[in-house]
């Protein structure tokens, strides 16, 4: 990759100076607005406090309105100030010159993170604006863009790309396909960050088309490791918030992520793009909300730490699409056996069981409990109509109590048990403990709970993002569709599944979301060409296209025994500390193995080498201080050295990755092949694998290093 020369366009330096000067003036005005709003708010509060007993109710009401207005004005001023501060650091990253058809002269547009105008003159256009799409989609020549008013055609006469940092232009280039590729490689060669960053200056054409897709109710993205699918989904949300700002806000979007560490890792992207933070939660937290006061459940178990064949079979059984069909069949038949009413008599009033049943069946789209409430209202209304003698009529809640007594099953747990018994599969349901479900039963239970009692639907959430789609079962998606009847962006990679007991595939998702648009991303950007070619051979991902960013080949480090492997691991750690990279991920196959490795590497403070057991050799307290363990209980991701399992590393990236125990015992099955692939593809710049004994067959034939 070439180093960029001095700025070849003097006019761009002049323009940047002019824009920076106007941003400085705008910042002064914004800060003055913030100070004025703060002062007005404080003065009004003081006046109300000083004259509390003297102000009449009308004046008090007016002052409260003034406080609310001042608060809104101040919040807007703070938002504008913060945006200008960010723009001063990097005002824009691109310029396009565009001449519309039948226009004699073209216009120049600078594209940045936010729009900025000074005294009604637009100086910077938001990257999400319709005209900005030409920077991502078009080369110099015939071009156009789709605006709300329709298609605008013309000619793109110039396209430039910039890197501005701390208000200083580092490079300016006439943009072309080759230059864009060079810029992308330059950006990808940087070290990793503790949080995912926006990619607005390097969005690729195929990515831009997904981001700006506003037509699809549900969009499903199948993307290989490192294809940027999570970042694309977040930028798509930012685009939709911009495009539909009148009816969609950040509080209307929910992200379902695999764990808190990943949620923290992606949490900065949306705010970086000028939007409010998005609400993020896990499948477990969602189940907690739905089942509070109903029933308890155990957390998802690590399948590698379970040695229970019956449990594995139960998990497999409930992970299939056929299981959803079986539950649907039961739900369809449920009205026939769950409610067999008798005549209802109250003093001189009477309705037959047949009439009650007809009314019950008429409300077929509603949960059983809601149907009964509606039938109770119908009975009450009928009694009121027939009440010629003006006798006392039973209230709906009295009628409902009687109708509930006619139910064959009183709660969802009884219904859930009946499902397995009636379907002849009673052995597939085992309680984890008293009134505690196994994790595999949680979403099937919720699915029946929706049919029997009803779920808490989210009317606030208007767009749901589901990441790591391959880790969730068809019944989980079926239950989610009941909870969130809204548009969805679903993303993941079926080449990176982490549960060997899940028996579902991408085609099952196509069946569940038969009207969704499916897109595939096969180009990988995260890792060097050498790392991705290495990973591609492990998992035979033929569709994967590595980015041509070259680096060192992966290192395979043979070790004499476990103690020697620990010594070699510490050598890798010392090399990392002496280098310029900022993050090293040490990725073990299981949570238990990660905990053990953490105890070995971080728990040997002050131990002399001759006092150490075979599996704990040499070290000092200074080495251990920057090592952290990432578990399901962790809440944040930080630079330094992180020890974790494959399942916890998904979605994360590290400058360097070290994979210990890459031997034939640890990575032996086809599923292990997938896990090793996931671990390898977390590395951006450097990958090292250590092993004692025989190396796993998935990496055999590669030359050893170190």
Where are these regions (language model features)?
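Short, hydrophobic/proline-enriched secondary-structure or compact coil segments at domain edges
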Residues: 92-98, 440-449, 584-587
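P-loop NTPase Walker
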Residues: 1-38, 186-302, 657, 678
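Extended, charged low-complexity regulatory segments
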Residues: 1-200, 204, 208-212, 696, ...
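Conserved helicase motor core of SF1/SF2 NTP-dependent helicases
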Residues: 246-247, 251, 260-276, 281-288, ...
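A structural signal for short, well-ordered beta-strand segments and their strand-loop junctions
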Residues: 95-97, 220, 255, 688-691
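Conserved phosphate/pyrophosphate-binding and hydrolysis machinery centered on Walker-type P-loop NTPases
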Residues: 189, 193, 317, 365, ...
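Alpha-helical nucleic-acid-binding subdomain
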Residues: 241-464, 471-479, 487, 495
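Conserved phosphate-binding and hydrolysis motifs of nucleotide-dependent enzymes
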Residues: 226-229, 467, 651
């Amino acid at each position: 990759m070439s180093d960029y020369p001095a700025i070849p366009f003097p006019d761009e330096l002049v323009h940047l100076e002019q824009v920076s000067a106007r941003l400085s003036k705008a910042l002064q005005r914004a800060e003055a607005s913030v100070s004025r709003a703060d002062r007005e708010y404080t003065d009004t509060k003081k006046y109300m406090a000083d004259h509390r007993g003297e102000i009449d109710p009308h004046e008090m009401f007016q002052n409260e309105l003034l406080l609310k207005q001042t608060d809104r004005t101040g919040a807007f001023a703070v938002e504008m100030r913060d945006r200008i501060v960010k723009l001063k650091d990097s005002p824009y990253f691109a310029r396009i010159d565009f001449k519309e058809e039948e226009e004699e002269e073209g216009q120049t547009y600078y594209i940045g993170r936010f729009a900025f105008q000074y005294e009604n003159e637009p100086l910077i256009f938001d990257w999400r604006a319709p005209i900005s799409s030409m920077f991502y989609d078009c080369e110099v020549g015939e071009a156009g863009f789709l605006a709300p008013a329709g298609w605008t055609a013309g000619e793109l006469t110039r396209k430039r790309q910039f890197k501005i940092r701390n208000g200083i232009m580092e490079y300016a280039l006439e943009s072309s396909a080759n230059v864009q590729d060079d810029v992308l490689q330059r950006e990808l060669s940087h070290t990793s960050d503790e949080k995912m960053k926006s990619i607005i200056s390097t969005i690729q054409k195929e990515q831009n088309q997904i981001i700006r897709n506003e037509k699809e109710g549900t969009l499903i993205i199948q993307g290989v490791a490192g294809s940027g699918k999570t970042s694309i989904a977040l930028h798509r949300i930012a685009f939709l918030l911009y495009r539909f700002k009148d009816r969609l806000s950040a509080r209307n979007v929910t992200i379902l992520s695999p764990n808190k560490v990943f949620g923290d890792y992606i949490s900065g992207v949306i705010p970086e793009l000028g939007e409010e933070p998005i609400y993020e939660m896990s499948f477990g937290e969602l189940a907690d909300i739905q089942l509070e006061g109903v029933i308890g459940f155990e957390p998802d178990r690590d399948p590698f730490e379970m040695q229970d064949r019956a449990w594995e079979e139960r998990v497999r059984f409930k992970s299939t699409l056929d299981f959803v069909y079986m539950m649907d069949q039961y739900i369809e038949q449920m009205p026939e056996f769950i409610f067999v009413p008798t005549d209802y008599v109250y003093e001189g009033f009477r309705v037959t069981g047949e009439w009650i049943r007809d009314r019950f069946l008429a409300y077929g789209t509603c949960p059983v409990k809601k149907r009964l409430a509606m039938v109770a209202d119908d009975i009450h209304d009928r009694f009121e109509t027939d009440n010629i003698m003006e006798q006392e009529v039973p209230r709906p809640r009295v009628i409902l109590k009687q109708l509930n007594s006619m139910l064959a099953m009183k709660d969802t747990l009884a219904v859930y048990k009946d499902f397995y018994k009636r379907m002849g599969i009673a052995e597939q349901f085992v309680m984890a403990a008293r009134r505690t479900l196994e994790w595999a039963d949680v979403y099937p239970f919720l699915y029946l709970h929706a049919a029997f009692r009803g779920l808490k639907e989210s009317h606030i959430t208007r767009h749901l993002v589901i990441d790591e789609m391959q880790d969730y079962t068809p019944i989980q998606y079926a239950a989610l569709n009941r909870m969130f009847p809204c548009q969805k962006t679903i993303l993941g990679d079926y080449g990176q599944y982490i549960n060997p007991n899940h028996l579902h595939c991408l085609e099952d998702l196509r069946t569940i979301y038969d009207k969704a648009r499916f897109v595939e991303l096969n180009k990988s950007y995260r890792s060097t060409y050498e790392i991705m070619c290495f990973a591609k051979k492990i998992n035979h991902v033929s569709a994967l296209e590595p980015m041509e960013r070259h680096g060192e080949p992966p290192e395979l480090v043979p070790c004499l025994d476990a103690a020697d492997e620990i010594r070699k691991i510490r050598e890798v750690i010392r090399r990392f500390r002496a280098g310029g990279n900022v993050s090293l991920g040490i990725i073990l196959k299981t949570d238990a193995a990660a905990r053990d490795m953490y105890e070995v590497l971080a728990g040997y403070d002050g131990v002399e080498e001759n006092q150490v057991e075979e599996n704990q050799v040499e070290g000092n307290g200074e080495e251990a201080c920057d090592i952290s363990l990432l578990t399901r209980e962790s809440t944040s991701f930080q630079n330094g050295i992180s020890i974790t399992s494959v399942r916890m590393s998904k979605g994360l990236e590290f400058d360097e990755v070290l994979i210990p125990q890459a031997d034939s015992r640890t990575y032996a099955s086809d599923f292990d092949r997938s896990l090793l692939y996931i671990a390898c593809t977390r590395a951006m710049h450097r990958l090292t694998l250590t092993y004692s004994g025989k190396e796993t067959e998935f990496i055999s034939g590669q030359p050893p290093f170190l």
